[in-house]
């Protein structure tokens, strides 16, 4: 539930390496 400061509209979350996932076009962690 914490925003990772990254969007995932066109590309996947690069921050997925630290546990972020795409939700509603924004990358979130928990």
From Swiss-Prot:
There is a cross-link at residues 1-30 (Cyclopeptide (Gly-Asn)). Disulfide bonds join 4-20, 8-22, 13-27. It comes from the Eukaryota. Keywords: Disulfide bond, Knottin, Plant defense. Expressed in petals, petioles, roots and runners but not in leaves (at protein level). One of its GO terms (biological process) is defense response. InterPro entries: Cyclotide, Cyclotide_bracelet_CS, Cyclotide_sf. It holds the Pfam family Cyclotide. PROSITE patterns: CYCLOTIDE (PS51052), CYCLOTIDE_BRACELET (PS60008). This is a cyclic peptide. The keyword Cell inner membrane does not apply. Belongs to the cyclotide family. Bracelet subfamily. The presence of a 'disulfide through disulfide knot' structurally defines this protein as a knottin. Probably participates in a plant defense mechanism. This is Cycloviolacin-O4. It comes from Viola odorata (Sweet violet).
């Amino acid at each position: 539930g914490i925003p990772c400061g990254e969007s995932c509209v066109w590309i996947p979350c690069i921050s997925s390496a630290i546990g972020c996932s795409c939700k509603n076009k924004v990358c979130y962690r928990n």
